[in-house]
Amino acid sequence: MELSSAEAVSTRFLGLTQRSVSEDLGCRRGEFSRKHYGSVELLISSDADGAIQRAGRFRVENGSSDENTGYTPGTWHRTDVHLENPEYYTRWYFKYFLGKVHQNYIGTDSEKNPFFLSVVLSDQNNQRVPQYHSILWRKTGTQKICLPYSPTKTLSVKSILSAMSLEKFEKGPREIFHPDIQKDLLVLEEQEGSVNFKFGVLYAKDGQLTDDEMFSNETGSESFQRFLHLLGDTITLKGWTGYRGGLDTKNDTTGTFSIYTVYQGHEIMFHVSTMLPYSRENKQQVERKRHIGNDIVTIVFQEGEETAPAFKPSMIRSHFTHIFALVRYNKQNDSYRLKIFSEESVPLFGPPLPSPPVFTNHQEFRDFVLVKLINGEKATLETPTFSQKRQRTLDMLIRSLYQDLMPDLHKNMLNRRSFSDVLPDSPKSTRKKEEARQAEFVRLGQALKLKTGVKGDAPTTLATTSFCKKEPWESQSFCSNFPHEVVCADSWGQSLLVSTDAGILLIDDGQTTVQVFDKTLQIKQMHVLEALDYLIARTDKGKDSRLLVFRLSSVQKDIETKQVIRSKYDCRENKLERTKGCHLYAINTHHSSELRIVVAIRNKLLLITKKYNPCNSLTGSSLSLSESPVEEFQYIREICLSDPPVVMTLVDGPTGDSDNMICVAYRHQFDLVNESTGESYRLHHIEANKVNFVAAIDVYEDGEAGLLLCYNYVCQYRKVYPFNGGSPLIQPSAYDFHFSWNQVPYAVVCAFPYILAFTTDSIEIRLVVNGNLVHTAVVPELQLVASRSDIYFKATAAVSGSSHSSSKEMSSRSSPQTPTAYDMLECSLSSSEGEVACKNLYKIPLSNLVGRSIERPLKSPLTPKVVTTPTSSGITSLPVTHSPSLSRMEIKEIANRTRKELLGKLPLFFSVYISYH
């Protein structure tokens, strides 16, 4: 590989001498606060005489500055608008199973509760990434996991259930052959919640403080009418064929008109108080309350100045409405102000309100409100009131289905069997019968899928969203056609220091690669500490492994002067001698007062710190000028464990004095070890036969330590309290929570507000505060390279001109028409099989994930409400406004053309529709 010239190297290191934004953010990436999502308050409403009428506890989100007290501006002010747990990613049975050959199994667990298992071998988003998608249906809900496909390794039903922590059975799983089972399983999936929504809209005049007064408003103001027009379109109810949200579309008994819109594939009907029937004789307006009072989410549009008495949820007599969105319009600056009230039991949901929660761009306000309300209704369905009802319904449906299938258990089912492909091999004598059964199975599934789409009940697709929207996790091409195997890496300024099979390389976007060490030095772990001028690395393996410490400035000088490339034998002076035989090390990653290093040598932990040096570099002390910084470190103590740790993380105590901790993972447990005393305490025990430890990530909520414990498919948050009498207070907390990944990750990265899981072929992105899924990117042959500051990963892509563009060029020319790196990956992988595949390096800037502050305009998850469409002449453009979903119209057109074919052979375009969805 050609080395750069001295001039190029000098130019490169101008960037190395400047600390990157990501380096500054990296030390506080684990800081977060739930206060950004509001605080719980006791809200009381009283009558005109001051007597208390109703009271309730609600979480109040107002985006006020007091929610951010004590936080450095820019530390966390995210306002990216994401639908949480989007149906496109969560409704697996509709997306991956219907219309395709798959297996369904029935069984009972050790407690005699029936369960169903569905398995399909599918191509992940048509990216030539075969995976087993598995769904376990139980009364407590569905569990979904992806398992890798191997053409040489068979996968049994038992092993799939074992991966789902279901290992003991009263009756082993047997396969269901009847195609009608697809209808029943689709009904089970629909219990997760409707894909369409109905929201109440209540108009309140200035000074109105009771629900009777608000519901009695016959008409709204001009500003209220403009707000309704912003929300959606006015539609005539009589004869309406779309989603009706419980309104009468035949006899006008619920009004003549309503407001309707489609947002990212979701149909939304608004129950507007002034459009519902009004009765002069009935002061309570029962008909209006019947609809709006039974909506989970209600928007309250309140007239008047901000100093006037404000709306409180306790003013509304409803036991069903859990979320209120208070909207005020300011005529002076043509802006909207938003405030959210959520019943205390509703889990946290985003997006958090900006500070201040004032929107001058009306389209962005519409996007924010709709996403907030959709996420809020989904979160409400997880409250005990709704989840217990859903569990009873699921239990009833599953038991009823089990009883219906019992007579056929021995006649039409097989015992448990192993399979390694979607289509199991059949004996020649029964192959024709099996093929006929599969054809009928697929035909029924495709017909069911189309029917669901025509009704408007299909999970949303990405067809109505903007593919060109810039997301915080959007990657940039960093290095094209990288031929080496990567062992580990870390950021150094704007460059990347990489340990490869060819040695240690310094890679910079748009620059020629520089070799720093030759291939005799094999580094397995590394940390580049720019602020301390250190490079820490673990080399080799087994008995010869050591911890090395280099001075960054010395390494930089060697490269600039083009001296001889260092080898393993030039690093003798950089060894920390007592670290021989180490297999793992960890450093404190956050802003504590001193650098701490813990080295694991089998089951022994060695604690190392940096010596306190009162002399600075300007004094000319021999210690500061020494080329090797080994003498600047001191050994504090040794701690013995019962087993060698697999995962190790340092946790900063609240005072930093005798209360720092080490989290270690081994066997089936995570333990906390006191750095000062060496005592260990059980933090979490894992009830599973096989444990795959992934990570233990230290995070700090409002300055208090917590840990994200990642193993198997699980990520669990545990809060760690200050030490009391020498031991940490480890106890269940209301803030502890856990969630499951869809695929077992090999690495997890926290960049608040996001947590990213890296698997062999995908990046799964969730929110830290609630574990909700926001995006899944399919990235074949994915390898995480570095993540301490900016995130770098290696992935397969076909050789093309677009893959050679630099991240700097991409950043400068990025526009709504510019495809993201993910788009380039997906496009290239869908090209012909004959193209030569290569590995490229991609970069996700940490500043995009955690570093943006609240500024106008807010990010919008959709294309603008009005877009321009070029005509054939290329000159004139037409405005296109939001309207009833085109996808529904297209589905109806397909249905009309294929109604006859549904009774016979499958048409070609039928399969096109199925694959599109």
Curated annotation (Swiss-Prot):
Molecular-function annotations in GO: GTPase activator activity
- The reply on keyword DNA repair is no
Write down a Pfam family by its short name. CNH
Which terms are listed as keywords in the entry? GTPase activation
Q: Where is the CNH domain?
A: 483-792
GO biological process terms, alphabetically, are: regulation of small GTPase mediated signal transduction
Asked if the Swiss-Prot or TrEMBL record annotates the protein with the keyword Oxidoreductase, the reply is no
Q: Start and end of every Rap-GAP domain?
A: 185-401
By its UniProt entry, which InterPro entries does this protein fall under? CNH_dom (IPR001180), Rap/Ran-GAP_sf (IPR035974), Rap/Ran_GAP_dom (IPR000331), Rap1_Ran_GAP (IPR050989)
What SMART domains has UniProt attached to this entry?
CNH (SM00036)
Family in the record: Belongs to the GARNL3 family.
Q: What is this protein called?
A: GTPase-activating Rap/Ran-GAP domain-like protein 3
Organism (species): Gallus gallus
